[in-house]
């Protein structure tokens, strides 16, 4: 079985070799852990963001930069293709580990989750568990982790602190924007799972999403980065569905972000109206705007949802001069 942490370790080695070109900074903590700053104090950029996305996906996807037509604007976007969608997206990429140690907080994603089984129910559902001597984690945070944070991660992953490797970028950074847009395929799979679909029948995934500019601090950027997927993210999935075609059609109808009661305005506005309480925001919003599913059993193809570039332009706050 594929070891997502072994795959991630190889990407980390590349990042260490190319840190100057990536405009990242490498820190060695007192307990031997490795921290790669991709945008907290370091400048980072598109290439650092690409490496972050590769790390999140355990290098189990083909990633490329492309352009997206945003009502006539040629906008930077990222394209994701994977033939290991469940392991790449759910066993690794999904941001399923909220890490809070003292005054430090970050959202953890990437391979290390498969060692700590974060969350355990998901790994039981997909039948995956990793076993590797090193833990590779991507942290979305505006602070760099210290030794206490590393010790917390090491304990949960059953590895030595010196074998913990963390790449960090805040939401309000180009690298952070890139790795969030690269979640376009994952958000669709997660939404499928949340509506009761057997995600293990998903055999491949493809998606494209625009990359948000830095529009403010982390909380504002959390809005614009999510909007890239919610309003202009487009995905394609290949599945082997054992049920009736009508049943598959019902599942596909439920997945796009358009089904959410909060759909229709920039996410930051929705979040602000909810007093910045995630639990008051409809979780169904976190999904691609449009998806297409090709079922290999019925050889039928189904599509649902639509793209809404005008809302994304509003979210970005672009001014023509």
From Swiss-Prot:
Reaction catalysed by this enzyme: 5,10-methenyl-5,6,7,8-tetrahydromethanopterin + H2O = N(5)-formyl-5,6,7,8-tetrahydromethanopterin + H(+)
Annotated EC: 3.5.4.27
Family matches, as Pfam families: MCH (PF02289)
GO aspect biological process, one term: methanogenesis, from carbon dioxide
Pathway the protein contributes to: One-carbon metabolism; methanogenesis from CO(2); 5,10-methenyl-5,6,7,8-tetrahydromethanopterin from CO(2): step 3/3
Main location: cytoplasm
Keywords, alphabetical: Cytoplasm, Hydrolase, Methanogenesis, One-carbon metabolism
Enzyme kind, highest EC tier: hydrolase
Localisation: Cytoplasm
GO cellular component annotations of the record: cytoplasm
Molecular function in Gene Ontology: methenyltetrahydromethanopterin cyclohydrolase activity
Domain of life: Archaea
Keyword Membrane assigned: no
Purpose: Catalyzes the reversible interconversion of 5-formyl-H(4)MPT to methenyl-H(4)MPT(+).
NCBIfam families, per database record: one_C_mch (TIGR03120)
HAMAP family: McH
Family: Belongs to the MCH family.
Protein known as: Methenyltetrahydromethanopterin cyclohydrolase
């Amino acid at each position: 079985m594929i070891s997502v942490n072994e795959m991630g370790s190889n990407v980390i080695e590349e990042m260490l070799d190319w840190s100057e070109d990536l405009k990242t900074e490498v820190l060695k903590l007192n307990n031997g852990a490795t921290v790669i700053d991709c945008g907290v104090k370091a400048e980072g950029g598109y290439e650092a963001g690409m490496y972050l996305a590769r790390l999140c996906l355990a290098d189990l996807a083909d990633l490329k930069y492309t352009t997206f037509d945003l009502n006539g604007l040629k906008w930077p976007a990222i394209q994701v293709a994977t033939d290991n969608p469940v392991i790449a997206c759910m066993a690794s990429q999904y941001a399923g580990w909220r890490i809070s140690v003292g005054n430090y907080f970050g959202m953890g994603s990437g391979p290390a989750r498969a060692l700590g089984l974060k969350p355990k129910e998901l790994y039981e559902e997909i039948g995956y568990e990793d076993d590797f001597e090193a833990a590779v984690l991507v942290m979305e945070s505006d602070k760099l982790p210290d030794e206490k944070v590393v010790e917390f991660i090491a304990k949960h992953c059953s590895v030595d602190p010196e074998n913990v490797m963390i790449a960090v970028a805040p939401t309000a950074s180009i690298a952070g924007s890139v790795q969030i847009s690269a979640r376009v395929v994952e958000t669709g799979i997660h939404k499928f799972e949340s509506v009761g679909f057997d995600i293990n029948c998903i055999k491949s995934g493809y998606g494209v999403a625009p990359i948000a500019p830095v529009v403010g601090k982390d909380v504002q950027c959390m809005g614009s980065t999510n909007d890239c997927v919610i309003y202009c993210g487009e995905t394609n999935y290949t599945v082997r569905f054992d049920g009736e075609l009508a049943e598959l059609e019902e599942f596909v109808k439920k997945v796009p972000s358009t089904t959410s009661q909060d759909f229709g305005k920039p996410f930051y506005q929705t979040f602000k109206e909810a007093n910045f309480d995630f639990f008051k925001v409809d979780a169904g919003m976190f999904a691609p705007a449009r998806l297409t599913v090709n079922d290999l059993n019925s050889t039928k193809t189904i599509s649902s949802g639509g793209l809404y570039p005008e809302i994304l332009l509003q979210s970005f706050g672009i001014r023509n001069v």
